[in-house]
Amino acid sequence: MSENQKEVSPPQAISVKSEASSSIFSKPISTSSPAGLAAAQRVTPGKLSTLLLEMGPLAIRHITQTLCLDIPCFKDLSSSKQRRLIMSAMESGDKEKSVVFEKIGWGQWSAKRVDPANFDKELEATNFANAKVKDLISQESQRRKSNNSNSNSGGKVEMPMKVEHNITNIDGATTPPTAVASTTIPVNIKRSKSPLAAANVVYIDENALASEDEDEEFDEDDHHLHYQNKSRNSSNNFGKSSNGDPYSFGRRRSQVVFADSTPENIEHEIIAQKIRPLLRNRRRSSIKPHTPFISKLNTHQDSSYLSPNTTSTTTPSNNNSNSNQAKIDLEKLTATSEPTSRRASRLSVSKESSIRSTLFPNKNYLIVTTNPNSKATSVSTSPKLEEQMNVSSNPIVLSDKEKHRVASQHLNGESSPQLVPHSHHQPHSDTDEEDWESIGAASLRNNSLAPNIDSVASSTNGVVSPKPTNPSFTNSQNGDIEPPLQHDQQKHEQQPRNGEDNSAAFLLMSLKS
């Protein structure tokens, strides 16, 4: 028995599957076939009016399911043919019972009794209203699709008041559970424009304004970090922005984009026009603090570099050669060579150190050269130097102790400084690290003057004070100017001498060599 059951069971399973597959993949019958014609003829307005008056309002799918149960072969028709048969019966109306079919939205239909005398007029008006609702629903379906793609937009479309009134008058007892669930479908759909949509039409480019604020901060830092390069053109282009500056405020404006000339756009444009002058004034006020900084930098330079009437004092020499061409002639520093002369002083303007006051030409020093062909010049234009130069006409006699000290300096190979401080009462010091008031003894105020012209002319190398002739010292004179010595060595600076003392010193130097 078990073997027979095993043999019979597979054919039974196969037959069940074949029936299921035939029912699933069954081809819908045509309306031209006898079964299709019989099913179509039984879909009448009277049958639909009876169904909707008893169970309405119903959706099309519920009406279709009820007709499939009542009419044989109706389920074998295609869904589109079923819908067309139902719609044609509703549009014709039930003239025998004076019932018209009204669409109340979203596929729900109801049956309404009318006056038999006005049946034709009511039927025409109802069909027109149904077509209107159909158009609204189709438009809503399209709007819902577009709303899914654009989540920022939303709105509200109101259905006719008549439809809402009909919904409220529906008897809940006659509505099946499926119809009650379908009545929860909203009739009003929100579809109005959001405030963000209007903001997208006209807007002020906030990115440009933010970048201008960043440029202002960067430009302020740029003035402090790179003012050395910018101050070169400050005398010619003061208060003007260069054309090549990528952070020029003159070319930056608020960008306003127009999409349509609606009243909202005009209102936004008026607001933008009121904002622009405030932004320009703000940018101008941010530039103003930089201009005193540039003018202060220009006034910080030495007066000898800014004034064309630069005075200098020279000492005559016997021979002229090309050995001193590498040195800067301070007599030629006029307004034409202003960029070259300003460059040395500008290099150290941000570093308050003694480099500027010792290496570069300064008004606190009197430059004395050791080459007979060179010139002893002064960059200062102070009246104290002129007074000292006027007093230097009288010869100065040294004591025996000072002569002995000078001779010992030559034997020991000590070198005298090149820069002699001549102004001991300066109103302002270039650096805070050096106190020029304490440099030098009180006697040097009267003795640190230019040497006698005869003694300088009679010397072999034009030395004001005795100096050794070693190669390292000569190379340092032809190269950079040496800084001043320490405070204790500056007490021995450049003692003027008469002709006999110079002769004795040079004799000792010749014996040493």
UniProtKB/Swiss-Prot annotation:
InterPro entries: Stb3. Interacts with SIN3. Belongs to the STB3 family. Keywords: Cytoplasm, Phosphoprotein. GO terms for molecular function: DNA-binding transcription activator activity, RNA polymerase II-specific; sequence-specific DNA binding; transcription cis-regulatory region binding. Residues 134-143, 488-500 have a biased composition (Basic and acidic residues). It comes from Saccharomyces cerevisiae (strain ATCC 204508 / S288c). The gene is STB3. Residues 1-20, 134-159, 227-249, 282-354, 373-437, 450-513 are annotated as: Disordered. It is found in: Cytoplasm. This is Protein STB3. Present with 639 molecules/cell in log phase SD medium. Its main location: cytoplasm. GO terms for cellular component: cytoplasm; nucleus. It comes from the Eukaryota. Pfam families: Stb3. Residues 296-306, 373-396, 409-418, 450-463, 470-479 have a biased composition (Polar residues).
